[in-house]
């Protein structure tokens, strides 16, 4: 098994050759380590990445044989968003995946992350075409500012919409594209401090925790609307999403 950090789908901003090849090269950077672990060797393009960062790979005797003998048997990855490669924009990698130019065709979260369920289907197909191994989505979710109503309920329909759309995209990848998907786990079950921004206000969970960004609060836990929705999704094995 190989688990990589969050992986974004990458689209070229235009059909300009520099955007197209730039997106391609940006993608290869993201997939370098999985290429090694699934193909059992360092790809030809790895040296150009090493040169870019001034890195010298030291291989011990027998390392190449070990890589070749023990390839990974499935790929686990996190998916939150897609990005656009624009030759005129900065393109970076963060805890949430690859990040580039904004996509005018997609809505975003309060933190500017594109919401793209179809992008997950795209990535599933891309990875299976590349590795021909089963896939496992181990993180998928949206950070949002949740509001507690006077009666204590949290109506996070936006989170339900996000998860529903992505689960439907997985179903299409399985049923229409015949991609073997082993499983899916959302991020996350309970609110915790965001690893990306250090904020408690950026909530991913289906269970609300009464704590603010300064650590103040009762720590009381409350089930959000998404909790009951996902409970039903589990009971029906994903057959009933509405």
Give the residues covered by each predicted segment.
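Active-site region of glycoside hydrolase catalytic domains
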Residues: 3-242
């Amino acid at each position: 098994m190989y688990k990589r950090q969050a992986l974004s789908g990458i689209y070229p901003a235009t059909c300009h050759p520099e955007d197209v090849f730039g997106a391609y090269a940006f993608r290869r950077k993201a997939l370098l380590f999985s290429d090694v672990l699934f193909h059992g060797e360092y790809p030809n393009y790895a040296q150009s990445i090493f040169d870019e960062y001034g890195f010298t790979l030291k291989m011990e005797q027998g390392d190449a044989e070990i890589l070749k003998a023990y390839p990974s048997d499935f790929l686990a990855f996190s998916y939150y968003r897609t990005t656009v490669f624009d030759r005129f924009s900065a393109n970076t990698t963060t805890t949430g995946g690859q990040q580039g130019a904004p996509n005018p065709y997609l809505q975003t979260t309060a933190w500017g992350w594109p919401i793209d369920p179809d992008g997950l289907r795209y990535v599933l197909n891309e990875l299976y075409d590349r590795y021909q191994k089963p896939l496992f989505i181990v993180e998928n979710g949206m950070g949002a500012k949740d509001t507690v109503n006077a009666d204590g309920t949290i109506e996070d329909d936006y989170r339900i919409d996000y998860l529903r759309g992505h689960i439907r995209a997985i179903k299409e990848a399985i049923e229409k594209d015949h991609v073997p998907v082993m499983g899916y786990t959302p991020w996350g079950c309970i609110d915790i401090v965001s690893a990306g921004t250090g904020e408690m206000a950026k909530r991913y969970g289906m269970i609300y925790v009464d704590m603010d960004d300064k650590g103040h609060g009762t720590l009381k836990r409350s089930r959000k609307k998404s909790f009951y929705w996902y409970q039903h999704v589990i009971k029906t094995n994903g057959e009933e999403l509405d």
